[in-house]
Amino acid sequence: MGSLSIWHWIVVLAVVLLLFGRGKISDLMGDVAKGIKSFKKGLAEDDEPAKTPAAPPEAPRPLPHQTSSAAEAEKKPV
């Protein structure tokens, strides 16, 4: 009772064909195919820039730092 038999699927298919008709279903499938094709094309375009080597990153520059006695001298005004 919980599973769908072949007759259930035939009735569902007949209702879908009556509601949408042959032309609308083929148009819908064409739109889905175009979407998949453009998605694959976008993925291929994203891969192309990754193949070209990028400029090496800049070496990090050390931050200037002070010794603790020099830092405390700046905090306390004379």
From Swiss-Prot:
GO MF terms, alphabetically ordered: protein transmembrane transporter activity
Residue spans crossing the bilayer: 1-21
UniProt feature, compositional bias: Pro residues: 54-63
GO biological processes: protein transport by the Tat complex
Locations listed in the record: Cell inner membrane
A GO CC term assigned to this protein in UniProt: TAT protein transport complex
The keyword Phosphoprotein is assigned to this record: no
Keyword Ubl conjugation: no
InterPro entries hit by this protein: TatA/B/E, TatA/E
Bilayer disposition of the protein: Single-pass membrane protein
Record's keyword terms, sorted: Cell inner membrane, Cell membrane, Membrane, Protein transport, Translocation, Transmembrane, Transmembrane helix, Transport
Region (Disordered): 43-78
Oligomer and partners: The Tat system comprises two distinct complexes: a TatABC complex, containing multiple copies of TatA, TatB and TatC subunits, and a separate TatA complex, containing only TatA subunits. Substrates initially bind to the TatABC complex, which probably triggers association of the separate TatA complex to form the active translocon.
Role summary: Part of the twin-arginine translocation (Tat) system that transports large folded proteins containing a characteristic twin-arginine motif in their signal peptide across membranes. TatA could form the protein-conducting channel of the Tat system.
Family: Belongs to the TatA/E family.
Protein name: Sec-independent protein translocase protein TatA
